[in-house]
């Protein structure tokens, strides 16, 4: 006998959970489409050489990589951005530029499983390809805000930085292994200040004083300062080198654009510690956290990558985008009690008291569906207790009962499962009116 078990870091999704996820994905998809992003799909499995060049050393350790039956070196995708690079390199001539795409799919990372972190999880990516304009960067942040608000979230913050600022800080302190240093800095929230200090000392051969001063600069944050006050505070950094100057100027321009979009200023702040560990980022980067659940980590992150297709094509295509971590958001929304708790998408359950009533019940269910009301027929003619118990368990809002009187008069009796109130022998049109109203109106 095989024990029915699931691998650590993976999970089954019960109907209630799957319904919640489908509802959230539908909402963010509508937001993406409203901004003109179009859907694409790429395979879960890619040649390893496609995925590996842009993966950090930490990510490379987490990639599921193996030889397939044809002895090909293949790997499961760890994000949706690297496959996008391969996709646009292959199809850019027919796509047209700039190209706005969204993709929703599962990705795989063999990281340590913990709350809100899985080894298989769903990403919702949206990207703007083929333009270096900061208008695109601002629009991506606008989509982040619109998406989270569509999920009934209001209390969050998009933390923004620029890779050139981090490169400029490393340059100022004479750090030669820039990518490695930024990979370590990106783990500040995960391993803490002492952990970052130890890794910088070990991996980048930096002395304690340099590390201390570097980390002091990396931890510069806007906090409660206004945008104008913060940019005045950091203006001196522009004189340090061109990287810092360019990074700060880009952030100033971005803030102008976000102001033009009338995005509330309390929803985005500058934080120099935001690095994004993936090596392909070159410009503005951002991570989004829920203010009440910061321990959950980033629920939406991304940034600009100006060398998207360098590994696949001589024609360089820039891009900027973000990814929503829908599985983490489900954890948060459940704790906030903002998700539908039902285990069915059908609003009405139709129960028959006798076998011969099923033809009428099925016609009734189809009429409800044609009217936009999801309905199902309980498949057995039983005492009324059993279908009512089923409806309570699944979460149907109404039970329509077909007994002898209802069958003969082509009516139905309707019970509101929330209020417990029941109306007997209703016409279809009257029942339709009631079902379409708020529950408390019955």
Curated annotation (Swiss-Prot):
Its main location: cytoplasm. Coiled coil: none annotated. Pfam families: HGTP_anticodon (PF03129), tRNA-synt_His (PF13393). Keywords: Aminoacyl-tRNA synthetase, ATP-binding, Cytoplasm, Ligase, Nucleotide-binding, Protein biosynthesis. One of its GO terms (molecular function) is histidine-tRNA ligase activity. It catalyses: tRNA(His) + L-histidine + ATP = L-histidyl-tRNA(His) + AMP + diphosphate + H(+). Its EC number is 6.1.1.21. GO terms for biological process: histidyl-tRNA aminoacylation. One of its GO terms (cellular component) is cytoplasm. InterPro entries: aa-tRNA-synth_II (IPR006195), aa-tRNA-synth_II/BPL/LPL (IPR045864), Anticodon-bd (IPR004154), Anticodon-bd_dom_sf (IPR036621), His-tRNA-ligase (IPR015807), HisRS-like_core (IPR041715), HisRS/HisZ (IPR004516), HisRS_anticodon (IPR033656). It is found in: Cytoplasm. It is an enzyme of class 6 (ligase). Belongs to the class-II aminoacyl-tRNA synthetase family. HAMAP family: His_tRNA_synth. Homodimer. This is Histidine--tRNA ligase. It comes from Helicobacter pylori (strain HPAG1). The gene is hisS.
């Amino acid at each position: 006998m095989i024990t029915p078990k699931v691998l650590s870091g993976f999970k089954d999704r019960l109907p209630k959970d799957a319904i919640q996820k489908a509802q959230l994905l539908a909402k963010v998809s509508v937001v993406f489409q409203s901004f003109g992003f179009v859907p694409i799909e790429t395979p879960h499995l890619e040649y390893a050489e496609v995925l590996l060049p842009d993966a950090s050393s930490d990510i490379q350790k987490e990639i599921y990589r193996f030889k397939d039956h044809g002895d090909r070196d293949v790997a499961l995708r760890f994000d949706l951005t690297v496959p996008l690079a391969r996709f646009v390199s292959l199809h850019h001539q027919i796509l047209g530029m700039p190209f706005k795409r969204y993709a929703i799919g599962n990705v795989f990372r063999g990281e340590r499983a913990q709350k809100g972190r899985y080894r298989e999880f769903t990403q919702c990516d949206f990207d703007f390809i083929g333009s270096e304009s900061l208008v695109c960067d601002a629009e991506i942040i606008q989509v982040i805000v619109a998406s989270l608000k569509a999920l009934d979230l209001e209390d969050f913050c998009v933390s923004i930085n620029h890779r050139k600022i981090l490169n400029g800080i490393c340059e100022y302190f004479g750090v030669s292994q820039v990518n490695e240093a930024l990979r370590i800095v990106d783990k500040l929230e995960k391993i803490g200040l002492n952990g970052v200090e130890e890794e910088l000392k070990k991996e980048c051969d930096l002395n304690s004083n340099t590390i201390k001063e570097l980390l002091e600069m990396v931890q510069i944050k806007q906090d409660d300062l206004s945008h104008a006050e913060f940019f005045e505070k950091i203006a001196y950094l522009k004189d340090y080198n061109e990287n810092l100057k360019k990074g700060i100027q880009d952030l100033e321009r971005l803030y102008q654009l976000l102001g033009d979009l009338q995005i509330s200023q309390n929803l985005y702040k500058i934080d120099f510690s935001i690095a994004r560990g993936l090596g392909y980022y070159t410009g503005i980067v951002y991570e989004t956290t829920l203010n009440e659940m910061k321990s959950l980590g980033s629920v939406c992150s991304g940034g600009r990558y100006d060398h998207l297709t360098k590994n696949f094509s001589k024609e360089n295509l820039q891009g900027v985008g973000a990814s929503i971590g829908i599985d983490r958001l489900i954890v948060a929304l459940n704790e906030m009690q903002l998700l539908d708790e039902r285990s069915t998408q059908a609003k009405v359950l139709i129960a028959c008291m006798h076998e011969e009533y099923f033809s009428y019940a099925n016609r009734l269910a189809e009429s409800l569906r044609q009217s936009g009301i999801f309905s199902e027929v309980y498949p057995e003619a039983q005492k009324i207790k059993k279908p009512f118990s089923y409806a309570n368990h699944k979460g149907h809002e109404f039970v329509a009962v077909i007994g002898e009187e209802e069958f003969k008069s082509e009516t139905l009796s309707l019970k509101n499962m929330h209020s417990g109130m029941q109306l007997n022998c209703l016409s279809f049109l009257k029942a339709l009116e009631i079902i379409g109203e708020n529950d408390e109106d019955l």
